Amino acid sequence: MSSLIPISTYNLALQPFNPVQAIDDEYPVTIRLTLAAVDPEAVDDKAEPSTLRLLKRSNLFVDDEDLDDDLLDIEAEEADELDSEEEEEEVKPKNKKKQNKKKVEEEEEDEDEEDLDIDGSSDEEDDEDVSEFVVCTLSPKVQFQQTIDLTITPDEEVYFVVTGSYPVHLTGNYVEHPADEDSEDEYDEDSEDDYNLTPDEDEIIGGEEYDLDDLEDASDIENKIEELVEEEAQGSKKRNAEEPEAPTSKKSKKAKKEDKKSVQFTKDLEQGPTGSTLVEEKTEKKGKKEKAKKEEPKKEEPKKEQPKKEQPKKEQPKKEEASKKFPTKTLLGGVVTEDRKTGKGQTAKSGNKVGIRYIGKLKNGKVFDKNTSGKPFVFGLGKGECIKGFDLGVAGMAVGGERRVVIPPKMGYGSQALPGLPANSELTFDIKLVSIK
């Protein structure tokens, strides 16, 4: 029994004279029963001890419905043959009719005997199909509980029934059985094609692309501003060279003052002087220096463009991470897990109180639920406090670990429709374990 790994707890309440199937068809997982306990409250006044019985049907026989259908077909064919024979006998002489009637009666007697043999054998087969076993007898006055060790697989058709005055409760575990893994091989092959569990580039890169784009836009704007300023400066110099130089001797003191004012004003605009030749020489030297300074950024422009060329190199590791395949595993019920990051410390198991962060998505990528901030979602693992796929998917994680869990409808909400969640939805959860107690 060492290969049977517990997954979650199993409980079944049995009322007297009410047969219950051991394994639910919607949750076909192997169970291991370890305890049977009696409820001290009787359902009648007889106060008779309760006997737990196991009813097991064998699948080695042919279905009764198929056998009945075959018998009906045979009887119909024989009836048609008899009708045709009777029509032919009416045309023949009376003496022949008498002989034929005797033959028909003999044939009918033989057929009746065969039918009786078939019916008797079918009843015997029905009795042989179902086997009844007594597991234990419990009573509040004598024995409250009994330890047992029964393992039942989904392939077995097993029912429990209680005879007596007291209800009986069964306790055990859902377990991982080697036979269950063999039955899930076909699903493993399909799941690799159906689910694209590799993260998108947007999920890995995040907002870094937007930051780089912003920097590129800023550098482009600065370069354009510098080019516009240089064009304006060159255009003003051409206009100044074409204008005739006015004689300084004819200018009045007021004109000189105005020239000085205009020169000071035009220096701020970097357009060069509009007055005397002395100021022109100074401004030409300054213009050359400024032009040299402005030409320097042009030489450095290839350096600014280098990050653009190197950017794909930086993104290559991220693209490699996006295309990297993470280890996947298919659990019972078709739940698929993909470990993105391995945590440290003890691993979560049935009975632990775990806290998680998660993002829940539908198959089309739409987010229907999430817990990314505030108080983490805390629940008891394996106690049925959440959907079955969560109990299976979180088991085995360590604190700091990240895992993607794909849950089929039967292990999620099934045919139940919720706001924003259609019925029979396949769910994908990105989970991070933050605490174990």
From Swiss-Prot:
Please list where the region (Disordered) is annotated.
Answer: 73-132, 169-349
GO MF entries: peptidyl-prolyl cis-trans isomerase activity
Biased composition annotated in UniProt, kind: Acidic residues = 73-90, 106-131, 179-220
Cell compartments where the protein resides: Nucleus, Nucleolus
Q: Does the keyword Ribosomal protein apply?
A: no
A GO cellular component annotation here is:
chromatin
| Biased segments, Basic and acidic residues type | 256-270, 292-324
Q: Where is the PPIase FKBP-type domain?
A: 351-437
Going by the entry's taxonomy, the superkingdom of the source organism is recorded as: Eukaryota
Activation and inhibition: Inhibited by both FK506 and rapamycin.
Which keywords accompany this UniProt record? Isomerase, Nucleus, Rotamase
The protein's matches in Pfam families, at most eight in alphabetical order, are given as: FKBP_C, NPL
The catalytic activity, as recorded, is: [protein]-peptidylproline (omega=180) = [protein]-peptidylproline (omega=0)
> What EC number(s) would the UniProt record show?
5.2.1.8
Q: What class of enzyme is it?
A: isomerase
The record's listing under SUPFAM superfamilies reads: FKBP-like
Question: What PANTHER family does UniProt report for this protein, alphabetically?
Answer: 39 KDA FK506-BINDING NUCLEAR PROTEIN, FKBP-TYPE PEPTIDYL-PROLYL CIS-TRANS ISOMERASE FKPA
Q: Which family does it belong to?
A: Belongs to the FKBP-type PPIase family. FKBP3/4 subfamily.
Role noted for this protein: PPIases accelerate the folding of proteins. It catalyzes the cis-trans isomerization of proline imidic peptide bonds in oligopeptides.
Name by which UniProt lists this protein: FK506-binding protein 3
Q: Which organism is it from?
A: Debaryomyces hansenii (strain ATCC 36239 / CBS 767 / BCRC 21394 / JCM 1990 / NBRC 0083 / IGC 2968)
Per the record, the gene is FPR3
